[in-house]
């Protein structure tokens, strides 16, 4: 991303009416609940959200932006076509956590030379974007902290992304720290507690969670959110002290 680029009596109901009422009530009560997975403890809180099943775009919408490219599912991945300049997808879910969670996904740049899966996600009451391959193809970091973009703040890293290659990203968010890995290699850990956390205007339409490309065609798959354990939260807070 460059500086210039870039939801009284008692009355008895008939049996059929009562059943219908109960069914509607149950549907309302369960709407929007996370899908339980094999990783969730029986009877306990849901610990993992599967945000993309590899088959369709349920739970997602095309991000509206100027001359945005198309979005489709192909070979088990969401393909985001190149736009003029940006394209993207945005989650329509209302049950996303805002802290003590891990967002993980796999992404590749199919063509182009800029960011191909910039991921916007919740951080407490705000949001931030992980840029991957911005500013000409290699800058990786958070936009924005204290108004400084990924190319200007302490999270800036230079990563060489090869077109056609899948990369695995993991981002963990706690009340104090945002920590990132690429292909299981820690990229950065930053304490944001006393910093202003905010997205750039260009990725604000990806809130609460979404992905964006810049003059590049990208693909995203295996999108999940997992709640962190107490041990992981403690480890994250220590990681930012190094």
Task: List PLM regions with ranges.
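Bacterial N-terminal signal peptides
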Residues: 17-27
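Carbohydrate-interacting regions of secretory-pathway proteins
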Residues: 30-242
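A short alpha-helix capping/helix-coil boundary motif
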Residues: 1, 18, 146-148
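N-terminal secretory signal peptides that target proteins for export/translocation
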Residues: 1-11
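Coiled-coil-like amphipathic alpha-helices with heptad-repeat character
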Residues: 6-7, 28-32
């Amino acid at each position: 991303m460059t500086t210039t680029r870039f939801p009284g009596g008692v009355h008895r109901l008939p049996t059929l009416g009562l059943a219908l009422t109960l069914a509607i009530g149950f549907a309302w009560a369960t709407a929007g609940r996370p899908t339980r997975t094999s990783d969730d403890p029986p009877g306990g809180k849901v610990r993992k959200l599967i945000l993309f099943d590899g088959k369709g775009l349920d739970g997602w919408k095309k991000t509206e932006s100027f001359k945005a490219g198309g979005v489709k599912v192909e070979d088990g991945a969401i393909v985001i076509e190149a736009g003029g300049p940006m394209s993207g997808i945005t989650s329509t879910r209302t049950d996303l956590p805002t802290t003590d969670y891990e967002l993980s996904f796999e992404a590749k740049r199919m063509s182009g030379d800029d960011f191909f899966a910039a991921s916007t996600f919740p951080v407490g009451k705000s949001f931030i974007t992980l840029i991957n391959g911005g500013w000409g193809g290699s800058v990786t970091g958070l936009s924005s902290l204290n108004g400084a973009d990924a190319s200007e703040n302490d999270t800036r890293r230079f990563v060489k992304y090869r077109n056609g290659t899948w990369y695995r990203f993991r981002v963990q968010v706690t009340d104090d720290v945002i920590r990132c890995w690429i292909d299981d290699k820690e990229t950065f850990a930053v304490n944001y507690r006393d910093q202003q956390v905010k997205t750039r205007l260009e990725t604000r339409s990806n809130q609460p969670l979404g992905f964006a490309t810049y003059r590049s065609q990208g693909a995203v798959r295996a999108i999940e959110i997992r709640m962190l354990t107490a041990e992981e939260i403690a480890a994250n807070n220590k990681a930012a002290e190094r």
